């Protein structure tokens, strides 16, 4: 199940109001949400249009949820930049995994010689 963090549209005509939600990527825009993370009111005064729980956003990003382009922009505009923190954590984990894989490959290659041909005779 691939998860998306995206906007769920509410409000009336010419008065949009959005909820920032975690949904299965196959759900329709206004479909069932797994969790509501916050709100986005594009018509509200500057500085009050976005409010969401950064800790829960980071929780879902660490578990592989992909933000939509608009939600990515909103997350980056918030202080603390949740996306940068998650990306640096992922890079740190990936580099440690690569180091472990490299050490394993080196230990295996030193332990056993590679056979030259299946029958033991050269072709």
Curated annotation (Swiss-Prot):
GO terms for biological process: translation. InterPro entries: Ribosomal_bS16, Ribosomal_bS16_dom_sf. One of its GO terms (cellular component) is small ribosomal subunit. Keywords: Ribonucleoprotein, Ribosomal protein. GO terms for molecular function: structural constituent of ribosome. Pfam families: Ribosomal_S16. Belongs to the bacterial ribosomal protein bS16 family. This is Small ribosomal subunit protein bS16. It comes from Treponema pallidum (strain Nichols). The gene is rpsP.
């Amino acid at each position: 199940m691939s998860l998306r963090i995206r906007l769920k549209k509410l409000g009336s005509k010419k008065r949009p109001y959005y909820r920032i939600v975690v949904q299965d990527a196959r759900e329709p825009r206004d479909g069932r949400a797994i969790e509501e993370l916050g709100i986005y009111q594009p018509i509200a005064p500057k500085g009050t249009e976005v409010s969401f729980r950064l800790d829960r956003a980071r929780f879902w990003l660490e578990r592989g949820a992909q933000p939509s382009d608009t939600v990515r922009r909103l997350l980056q505009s918030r202080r603390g930049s949740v996306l940068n923190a998650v990306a640096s954590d992922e890079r740190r984990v990936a580099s440690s995994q690569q180091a472990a894989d490299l050490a394993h490959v080196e230990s295996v290659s030193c332990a056993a010689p590679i056979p030259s041909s299946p029958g033991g005779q050269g072709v």
